[in-house]
Amino acid sequence: MKSYLVGGAVRDALLGLPVKDKDWVVVGATPAEMLALGYQQVGKDFPVFLHPQTHEEYALARTERKSGQGYTGFTCYAAPDVTLEQDLQRRDLTINAIAQDDSGEFIDPYHGRDDLKARLLRHVSPAFNEDPLRVLRVARFAARYAHLGFRIAPETLSLMREMAENGELEHLTAERVWKETESALTTRNPQIYFLMLHECGALKVLFPEVDKLFGVPAPAKWHPEIDTGIHTLMTLAMAAMLSPAVDVRFAALCHDLGKGLTPPHLWPRHHGHGPAGVRLVAQVCERLRVPNDIRDLAKLVAEFHDLIHTFPILKPRTIVGLFDSIDAWRKPQRVEQIAITSEADVRGRTGFEAKDYPQARLLREAWEVARAVSPKEVVEAGFTGPAIREELTKRRIRAVAAWKEERCPQPAAEG
């Protein structure tokens, strides 16, 4: 019986990155022997145990054989005669198939260390194509390690393309797709995840509303990058620079879905694409069972991002109405979230990456002015029932109007 450190802990240590969780594989042991040593069994589908002191996971060496469709269609074989090399062979990427023994020596039968040096994400064996979830995992690793220069090996990308074409991805559950996507959205370069899915054809299967944006032109004057799919990824990249929050990043991804509905004879203009895209956002979120708070923000950003771009010329009544529409009084964080996504939209364009976005500052300022109007004072002034809300709205509009007169004087008529 011998234990080896495997997977992410070995990989990240070799990359000089912080090691979070340690996973171990045990060769030459039975479940009874593990239990006798005080390990606690937690795995249902295959034997996984928690160490009695460290509570780190120890899995018995195993092989997997395809026995059905999708990522759950596997039969596992765990027994003392399964070798370390056999266990490593079932893993997805060579960089995840490196083991280390207690003396510090590496066992690397699939040359994962060479691929780490070459910054390559390469599949271990042709059995890679038996698990469709691996397409998303590899795209996520590409996003996670993009800042280190990693790229997907051409032969692995080709295999991912075959998997997308043969219908295997359709067996993935909504929960698994969202879990991988949510994890990818937390990386430093989440746009790479969606770019890789687009390149291998998986985006068309899993996110057709986003995939449809590629090849849709926008006016070159406002969008030198022209392609709306490219703009979407640039906006997501900018949102990731401005905020670590998944809801903000997902909203950036979905902000222009409505442009995919524009009839080609109207290109490159997309009048009304924001409100038109709201139902597409809802469609994506329903299909993938996206959490409600993330869904709701994405719908609001789709509907109102273009309005924010015109903030300096908005009427005070429109500004207060915007705060009503986004339910800012109960969910004040939405003001900041929408400010960030609107800024990401403007700066997510070729040549505009460093552009100042005063609209975000004005939005924040106007919000502070409007929220400073006291509901308590309205009640104390004798207003009751629906009249409270009416008077509160009037006072907020007056306050915003006074602020706006000072901050954004308009010589011409407002729009």
Swiss-Prot record:
Note on how the cofactor is bound: Magnesium is required for nucleotidyltransferase activity. Nickel for phosphatase activity.
Biological processes, Gene Ontology terms: RNA repair; tRNA 3'-terminal CCA addition
PANTHER family per UniProt: MULTIFUNCTIONAL CCA PROTEIN
Tagged with keyword Transport: no
Keyword annotations from UniProtKB, A to Z: ATP-binding, Hydrolase, Magnesium, Metal-binding, Multifunctional enzyme, Nickel, Nucleotide-binding, Nucleotidyltransferase, RNA repair, RNA-binding, Transferase, tRNA processing
Note: A single active site specifically recognizes both ATP and CTP and is responsible for their addition.
Protein family according to the UniProt entry: Belongs to the tRNA nucleotidyltransferase/poly(A) polymerase family. Bacterial CCA-adding enzyme type 1 subfamily.
Name of the featured protein: Multifunctional CCA protein
Organism field: Cronobacter sakazakii (strain ATCC BAA-894)
Signal peptide per UniProt: none
Cofactor(s) this protein cannot do without: Mg(2+); Ni(2+)
NCBIfam families xref list: PRK10885.1
Ligand binding (ATP): 8, 11, 91, 137, 140
Family annotation (InterPro entries): CCA_bact, HD/PDEase_dom, HD_domain, NT_sf, PolA_pol_head_dom, PolyA_RNA-bd, tRNA_CCA-adding_enzyme
The record's note on its domains: Comprises two domains: an N-terminal domain containing the nucleotidyltransferase activity and a C-terminal HD domain associated with both phosphodiesterase and phosphatase activities.
Gene Ontology molecular function terms on file: ATP binding; CCA tRNA nucleotidyltransferase activity; cyclic-nucleotide phosphodiesterase activity; magnesium ion binding; phosphatase activity; tRNA binding
Record: residues binding CTP: 8, 11, 91, 137, 140
Catalytic reactions on record: a tRNA precursor + 2 CTP + ATP = a tRNA with a 3' CCA end + 3 diphosphate; a tRNA with a 3' CCA end + 2 CTP + ATP = a tRNA with a 3' CCACCA end + 3 diphosphate
Residues that, per the record, bind Mg(2+): 21, 23
Function: Catalyzes the addition and repair of the essential 3'-terminal CCA sequence in tRNAs without using a nucleic acid template. Adds these three nucleotides in the order of C, C, and A to the tRNA nucleotide-73, using CTP and ATP as substrates and producing inorganic pyrophosphate. tRNA 3'-terminal CCA addition is required both for tRNA processing and repair. Also involved in tRNA surveillance by mediating tandem CCA addition to generate a CCACCA at the 3' terminus of unstable tRNAs. While stable tRNAs receive only 3'-terminal CCA, unstable tRNAs are marked with CCACCA and rapidly degraded.
Alphabetized PROSITE patterns for the sequence: HD (PS51831)
Species lineage: Bacteria, Pseudomonadati, Pseudomonadota, Gammaproteobacteria, Enterobacterales
Domain of life (superkingdom): Bacteria
One Pfam family here: PolyA_pol
Assembly information from the UniProt record: Monomer. Can also form homodimers and oligomers.
Residue span, HD domain: 228-329
Enzyme Commission numbers on file: 2.7.7.72, 3.1.3.-, 3.1.4.-
